[in-house]
Each structure stands twice: as structure tokens, then as C-alpha cells.
Design a protein with these regions (language model features):
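ER/Golgi luminal nucleotide-sugar-dependent glycosyltransferases, focusing on the catalytic module
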Residues: 1-155
Length: 155
């Protein structure tokens, strides 16, 4: 059991010590957010509709109320994660997240679920303002000033 989880993925480098015990996390905190410039409305709506929740669908459709969570990378309290899962059963999305396109939609859907139930908080701001987009691994030395580095690989 854990009180707080830090969810990151494999193309992330924690470049400086981060004392998470000093980061105030009421319910959750995204590592990075992003705007709605690249929404995939049809795919996202298909996922949102799985929950059969009109209030959630209305919230999702009002793009002024929420932003995406880059890579779904989040600091989240265990009790809040349990609350979200009990309310929405996020495992319903397993059948819908099958490829990169769906994973990008999931970044918006999980962000929507978290923000509908709790005020949005972000640790590092907007990913598109935080660092240069598309930093390859062999250039991460140019980002030593950043506490967390996101790099891109060609898979």
C-alpha cells in the first residue's frame, strides 16, 4: 500500500532530487499539462461514453474546464485513485487503449476524470513551454537545468 504514487514513463529522466514529501498534493498533481490543440474527439468521446455518465460527458465537452495530462504522468494520492476507480471503473478503458493514438486519447480522458472530481494542479506547467519538443536522448545534456527531462526516441 502507498499513500502517494508518482506515475512516469520510460522516456523521462529525473535530473535533480525531488523531495516529494514537500510537494503538496491534495488529490493529484499532473507533471505536465497540455492544451486542446490536438484533441482526437471521436476516439476520446468513444472512451468517455464507456462510463455512461451524462455529467462527465458534459464536463468533457466543455474544454474550458480541463486540460490534458501529458503522458498521464501524475502524482496521485492512493485514496483519490481508489475514489476515481470506484466511481468510474477505469479498467473499462482497457479495451479501448490499444495503440499510440488511443494512448494519446487516454491522456485526455484520464485528465478529464481527475479534473472533474478535483481541482487541477500541475507541477511543471505546460509541456510545450517547459522544454523543446522532440529532444533526442543524445541531447539531454543541454537540459541539465531542468529537474525532469522528457526525451523522445524513435520506436
Amino acid at each position: 500500500m502507498f499513500d502517494i504514487a508518482v506515475i512516469i514513463h520510460d522516456s523521462i529522466i529525473i535530473n535533480k532530487y525531488i523531495d516529494f514529501s514537500y510537494i503538496n498534493v491534495d488529490k493529484y498533481k499532473f507533471l505536465w499539462e497540455f492544451e486542446h490543440d490536438w484533441d482526437q474527439i471521436e476516439d476520446e468521446s468513444r472512451m468517455i461514453n464507456v462510463f455512461n455518465d451524462l455529467e462527465l460527458k458534459t464536463f468533457y465537452e466543455n474544454k474550458d474546464l480541463w486540460k490534458g495530462c501529458f503522458g498521464c504522468m501524475t502524482i496521485i494520492r492512493h485514496d483519490y485513485l481508489i475514489y476515481i476507480n470506484n466511481k468510474y471503473d477505469i479498467s473499462k478503458l482497457l479495451y479501448y487503449v490499444l495503440d499510440k493514438y488511443n494512448r494519446q486519447s487516454f491522456e485526455r480522458v484520464i485528465a478529464c476524470l481527475l479534473q472533474k472530481e478535483g481541482k487541477k494542479e500541475v507541477l511543471l506547467g505546460n509541456i510545450h513551454k517547459y522544454c523543446n519538443w522532440g529532444i533526442p536522448f543524445n541531447e539531454i545534456d543541454k537540459c541539465k537545468n531542468l529537474p525532469v527531462i522528457k526525451y523522445w526516441t524513435g520506436r
